[in-house]
Regions:
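Short, hydrophobic/aromatic-rich segments at coil-to-beta transitions
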Residues: 51-59, 83-92
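OB-fold and OB-like single-stranded nucleic-acid-recognition modules
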Residues: 155-293
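Boundary at the C-terminal end of the N-terminal hydrophobic targeting segment
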Residues: 19-23, 42
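Bacterial N-terminal signal peptides
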Residues: 8-16
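Tryptophan-anchored aromatic micro-motifs
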Residues: 32-71, 136
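Positively charged n-region of N-terminal signal peptides that target proteins for export
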Residues: 1-4
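A short, surface-exposed beta-strand/turn
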Residues: 101-128, 268-269
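Short, cysteine-centered beta-strand-loop-beta hairpins and adjacent loop/turn segments enriched
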Residues: 65-67, 94-105, 239-243, 277
């Protein structure tokens, strides 16, 4: 799982509040903090010409961060509306607090783009004591407006830096962003009409681009496609539950795929050879994606 220094900085700040609340027996602290969290200040930045916000967001999500061995978490794009230019990044992280107490932090951050300007606004930032699996134990403590404002500023600064990466570094995250199956499915789901979705895919061609993702195996069969021995029929299930699963056809000559069991979750790597669209759908819905190892 990926960690970011952003998560750890804010997480440590909230750990102090959660531990203090528990040790002091302040049962109403959560409500008081919620009341203080309503007026957080959004942070803003500029999108340079020739760059787009999504690769910069993915650069935040896939950064290795502080390298702390005491934390574990995941940061992912939970929602994307390409027509509106709005994106939501969600995060869950488990870490030991100052007194050695395991705690979990959940956050949801909205990032919106209007022409060449972007803004970052934290909608949720809360901490609670937890077990080793992240199951909550006790009350959630919502961050103050000050805490959320600090996170907004940290993330906006990080996104701005990522928007000005070298061409080589930017291209790496551009590839990650636009070959992400959740992103591809979101385009079809959120576009107001087919033509807008078609235009997006025309501007962001993904065929022959490298990708890797985790999929749920349905079956492994002999391939009828030329140059490949096996066809693995899979299903990609987006983290955003509002999106439909995507059928994935994975073509390989690797004998190891024979050992893939139905309903098992496996990681596949390869190049996108074709995206198949449902031309009869009201939206530009993806019917399946073909991947070649």
């Amino acid at each position: 799982m990926k960690k970011t220094f952003v998560a750890l900085v804010v997480f440590l700040m909230l750990c102090v509040a959660a531990v203090s609340a528990k040790s002091s027996g302040l049962g109403s602290l959560g409500k008081n903090l919620s009341a203080l969290s309503r007026n957080a200040k959004a942070a803003e930045g500029t999108v340079p010409e020739g760059r787009e916000i999504l690769p910069a967001i993915f650069a935040v999500m896939y950064s290795d961060g502080s390298g702390s061995e005491k934390s574990d978490g995941i940061m992912y794009l939970s929602k994307a509306d390409f027509d509106a230019g709005t994106y939501t990044v969600s995060q869950k992280i488990i870490m030991k607090g100052p007194l050695g107490v395991l705690q979990r932090q959940d956050s949801e951050i909205d990032i919106s783009v209007n022409e060449s300007q972007f803004s970052v606004e934290t909608k949720k930032l809360a901490t609670c004591n937890s077990d080793k699996n992240g199951n909550p134990k006790g009350d959630w403590i919502e961050a103050t407006a000050s805490g959320k404002s600090k996170l907004n500023k940290i993330l906006a600064d990080e996104i701005s830096r990522n928007l000005n990466l070298s061409d080589k570094e930017y291209a790496e995250f551009e590839n990650k962003a636009y070959t992400d199956f959740g992103v591809l499915q979101s385009v079809a789901s959120t576009s107001s009409n087919k033509l807008k979705a078609k235009l997006w895919f025309k501007k962001h061609p993904v065929e022959k681009k490298s990708m890797e993702t985790k999929v749920l195996v349905s079956s492994v069969d002999e391939s009828k496609a030329e140059n490949y021995a096996y066809k693995v029929s899979c299903l990609y299930v987006p983290l955003d539950k509002k999106l439909d699963p995507v059928i994935v056809n994975y073509y390989s000559n690797n004998d190891e795929v024979i050992g893939f069991k139905p309903d098992s979750l496996v990681e596949i790597k390869g190049k996108i050879s074709k995206i198949n669209f449902d031309e009869y759908s009201m939206t530009y819905k993806i019917s399946s994606i073909d991947i070649e190892e």
